[in-house]
């Protein structure tokens, strides 16, 4: 029975791994997804010896530690998914900051499009707030992310003079720091309360980073596609742990 469950999980993870591999570059999330897939198939092929090892001696402790690790990982992923709701934007903020993501050629990617659509919906309800699109030119990209973002919003009907462009940043921290600079250069000085737009899975870490740049952030969480959700959450947890215990800035 358990072996059949593992086999079903292995097949599902394989389909997810292949699907995401066809639409994304190699990332930590994708690598972890393939690692889990391979591990599940190994578990199916060598089920009997593995089960025997885990049923006695040190194997019992390895099994307990493994189960605990899985529970903690799943719990943390659930926390990351819910965290954006704790500090959700209300419309009382002073500006909207849309953080960049990868491009597909000259066009915004699916992930970035979802952020821009979330920003657009929020901006339509709060027409007095300036919009900062922030993102430089990543490796292998044909243009800056912010230029593609601005173009997308203009096509959706946002006035060009409402959109401020920040095209030098290469990290989340720089997104927030340079966005503040662009706001100040355009007459929006001493902006501290911002509504930032990110996909739900990384709103928590982005909020921590924003606070350390002197901002009072509130999240406008964007959705994410079903195929991208699992690898993105798998990648985000190590990033959060790295930020908690190593970088802290």
Language-model features: where?
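A transmembrane-helix-recognition feature enriched in membrane-embedded lipid enzymes
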Residues: 229-249
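Hydrophobic alpha-helical transmembrane segments
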Residues: 6, 62-66, 233
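Cytosolic-side transmembrane helix boundary signature
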Residues: 36-68
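A structural signal for short, hydrophobic/glycine-enriched beta-strand patches
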Residues: 75-235
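Membrane-embedded alpha-helical segments of integral membrane proteins
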Residues: 1-49
